[in-house]
Amino acid sequence: MVLLLTLGYPMTTAKLKAMFSNSRLTAAATGTLILSLIPHQEPRFLLPCIPLLLTCVRLPSTADWRRYFWISWIIFNAALGLLMGVYHQGGIIPAQLALPALIQHTHPSVSHADVFWWKTYPPPTYLLGDHGPGADLEIASVNSMGMPQSELLQTISLALEKHGAPCSGASLIPSFLRTQKDFYIAAPLSAWRSGKPFDPQDLSFVTDRPALNLTHLATFPKHINLDDMDFGEEGVYNTLARVVGRRGLGVWRVGRSCPP
């Protein structure tokens, strides 16, 4: 849009009439305006407007401006290609492929494991291979993408009470009714709010039940979570420092801190 406005400078009535008599430009501008008025729309919904807008762009006529145009075009596409093609949600597939080995290395005797995928897209489950129902190691992917942090921790705490090793050595649920499970969290490093300087190796949280300890197993560094940016609350600098500075997708095993 900025490029189109620049090409229309100076904004005379004749130029504006000529621009908006273009049906492709009018369709793209109208669609962008309508979608922009509706809250919680994602940028990808505007993708159909891009081909329409590109057909309305006239390349600069002078050699210098034409050179600037192509330089900026190459830089823009290289930067967006790196961001969206490598880093945007880029740790999901490597993490999903590595999970069976991570779980078996951490707890070789476990037969059931639930992995909570939090603040990230749910991964393709077929990448787990033969770890579905009935396998020696059954891995279930739990979609927790939109959960608040407190709700996620409470949910896992309840699940640990039901399926984890009891703190007291005894449980209200008879052993023959208990399915022993391990619980894991796969989440962007930037998603955690811990109230102290962030260290993926030292994460613990207090819930209404015994405190939770998170044992860090792995980090997949080529991952940026663009869906957890809050410029209104944190400001531009703090948001970018958190999302870009703490880039990466981590995997943690969740356990309880039982009182002595």
Question: Model-flagged regions — what are they?
Answer:
Residues 63-250:
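Catalytic lumenal/periplasmic loop and adjoining terminal transmembrane helix
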Residues 15-25, 66-67:
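Membrane-interfacial loop-to-transmembrane alpha-helix junctions, especially the N-terminal start
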Residues 4, 24-33, 49-61, 68-79:
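Hydrophobic alpha-helical cores of multi-pass transmembrane domains in eukaryotic membrane proteins
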Residues 1-19, 32:
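Hydrophobic, aromatic-rich transmembrane alpha-helices
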Residues 10, 16, 39-42, 54, ...:
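Short amphipathic alpha-helical interaction elements and helix-loop-helix interfaces
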Residues 22, 26, 35-50, 63, ...:
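Membrane-interface catalytic loops of GT-C/OST-like multi-pass glycosylation enzymes that act
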Residues 3, 30-56, 99, 181-189:
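C-terminal, well-structured subdomains that either form a transmembrane helix-short loop-helix hairpin
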Residues 249-260:
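C-terminal helix/juxtamembrane-tail motif
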